[in-house]
Amino acid sequence: MTTVHPEPSGRVVAEPRWLTPAQQRAWRAYMDGHQRLMTALNRQLQRDSDLTVAEYRILVLLSEAPDRSLRMSELADGVLSSRSKLTHQIRRLEAQKMVRRNTCLEDGRGVLAELTDEGLRRLQTAAPGHVEAVRRNFIDLLAPAQLEVIADVFGRVDEEIGKHSG
């Protein structure tokens, strides 16, 4: 419960709802585990494929899109990134001939990111090692019921935060 008290200025300030020891343990385990997992996945992808997790995710989303292309705004939403950060990542992928940008023919204003044949080849080459790293460092450590709980919990977190971030 939040405790409310007045400051000397007369302004009312709410006391923070501090985490219980159990809540703090869960939060820290999540933060530490997530950081270590993403570091391990990034390391594997960079070592084996010269890709980051963010770049891999871009290639995956483009590979799943009709005509292997998406508007930059849709792609930014899909990878949960700012448009400026995505533009930087797309430039790096363009330099490696994995992605190309085109003007959207529908309105002539939007920009499409399109996965090239080289990008698809690199994704297909990177995928087996990446999936193995995901299995080894995450999936295989959990029982099916735990995976369901994680999917439910983070689906809910994503949905709630998504309602307010946009």
Feature roles, as predicted:
Residues M1-S49, Q96, E148:
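N-terminal leader segment of winged-helix/HTH proteins
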Residues M31, V60-D67, A127, G155:
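Short, locally clustered residues in the helix-turn-helix/winged-helix DNA-binding domain
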Residues T39-S84, G166:
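N-terminal helix-turn-helix DNA-binding core of bacterial DNA-binding proteins
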